[in-house]
Amino acid sequence: IEHLKGTTEHYAYALTELHQQITPDPSKAVVTPLKTDAILALATSTMEHYSLRPSKIHGKAKATLFPTILSYMGFGGYLNPFTHEAQVNTLQPKLRIITTACHEIAHQWGIAAEDEANYFSIKATTVSDIVLVSYAGHLLAFQNLVNALYRTDADQAKAVMEKLPEGILENIREVRAFWEKYQNPFEEVFERSYDQYLKANQQQAGIKSYSLVVDLLVDDYINR
């Protein structure tokens, strides 16, 4: 748990520094004036310049035609199995669009495992020279880590959260509020179906594989 706490604090500190670079007001959430197409293009270029991109393999994210349906299903995006296009739910908060697009592009590269696609998305965005992109990546990493910390030691997780500027907390609440708005009785059915789909495609952890990115981030922190 000490490694998890240390990793969570590491990302909390980096997130706070990035927030200060974007806005001098600690109480303000980070917002972007960029339109959806520009955000998707930014995510695509972020992955294009990522050093771990497989040679001769490219990817591009595009907005799904069914964002409302995806929202009710609880999905931020998906890889179209027929066209191999990275489809992104563009109704979600813009910061999350960036990391979701990168996640789906990782699938285009051939990264099938959800935890590894999440990891590639976080690694590509956090090392970006564009502060907004780096903030989005650090925010996603932190949310995964602090959620894991809550499950193991709620008091320590709360202590980390209490040190964050109000603006970062507002960004976190924005994501939570978005998904809560679309909660419905059928969401659990969709999740169970997708869980079985993942298991049928050699991802034994099923839908829980999304959270396994925490292990990869902690390993990175230990071996940094």
Cite the ranges covered by each PLM segment.
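Pan-zinc metallopeptidase signature
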Residues: 167-224
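Short conserved active-site loop signatures built around small residues
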Residues: 12
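Solvent-exposed, acidic/flexible segments
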Residues: 36, 90-98, 110-114, 132-135, ...
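Active-site/pore-lining binding-face segments in mid-to-C-terminal subdomains
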Residues: 119-121, 126-170
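Active-site recognition of the HExxH zinc-binding catalytic motif
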Residues: 99-118, 122-123
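Alpha-helical transmembrane signal-anchor/signal-peptide segments
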Residues: 1-7
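Sec/Tat-exported extracytoplasmic proteins
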Residues: 15, 19-26, 46-50, 90, ...
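Auxiliary, metal-adjacent structural segments of Zn-dependent hydrolase domains
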Residues: 19-95
